[in-house]
Amino acid sequence: MEEVKILNPFDQNVIETLPFEDEKSVFMKLERAHQLFQDHRKQLPKYERIQILERLAEKISADAEYFAQEAAAEGGKPIADSRIEIARAIDGIKIAIRELCTLKGEEITMGITASSTNRMAMTIRQPRGVVLAISAFNHPFNLIIHQAIPAIAVGCPVLIKPALTTPLSCRSIINLLHEVGLPKDWCQMIFCDNTVTGKLVSDSRVSFLTFIGSEKIGWMLRSQLAP
């Protein structure tokens, strides 16, 4: 199995070595996420999602310096910048909680035709399915929060592909989510090459793609999405 050395860009020291996942492993994760979403008995009620996100914010706040040091090491950034990044990530989680508390459907006006008299109609917001989040290297902690937390908040399983040079912050976030009560298949990291990623993007089980990166790559990935 091929391995990837995670380097500190500042001094080129090896921080850790992670194994590449093969195509079979990646698509097994996709299938688990898809089956999870299809099983309505396993949907997480809104109050549980809120509690999970609240505990996540508390955990990150308690160990903020550790996560800042980790992001700085794998990203090669000044520690001051990474500390700001972690603070922004915590704010991002709190914003998701606030939005979740106010997210609602709409009542549709009835009684304007004879057939709609004495009737009520409304819209209800529902999660759309499995989210694939392809992230970038420059803010490895906060960008994952921006992409994954909204998906989890509204009840969508999410697969996260971090930048190959900065996967450690992503792994830490996912471990924390599992630690505070999110079932494992709701949020999974995939660490694979671009060929496997391209096949994943075009799979019909992916309901939504969130991508952070160049315009060129973004439009290319968009063109590969399943109808």
Q: How would you label these PLM feature ranges?
A:
Residues 93, 170-173, 200, 221:
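Hydrophobic packing residues within well-ordered alpha-helices of enzyme cores
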Residues 19, 134, 159-163, 190, ...:
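Active-site-adjacent beta-strand anchor residues
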Residues 130, 180-227:
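Conserved NAD(P)+-binding/catalytic subdomain of aldehyde/semialdehyde dehydrogenases
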Residues 24, 62, 66, 77, ...:
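Short alpha-helical
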Residues 109-184:
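Conserved small-residue-rich beta-alpha loop and adjacent elements
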Residues 49, 71, 93, 131, ...:
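Conserved hydrophobic/aromatic pocket- or pore-lining residues that grip, position, or stack substrates
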Residues 1-119:
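N-terminal Rossmann-like NAD(P)+-binding subdomain of aldehyde/semialdehyde dehydrogenases
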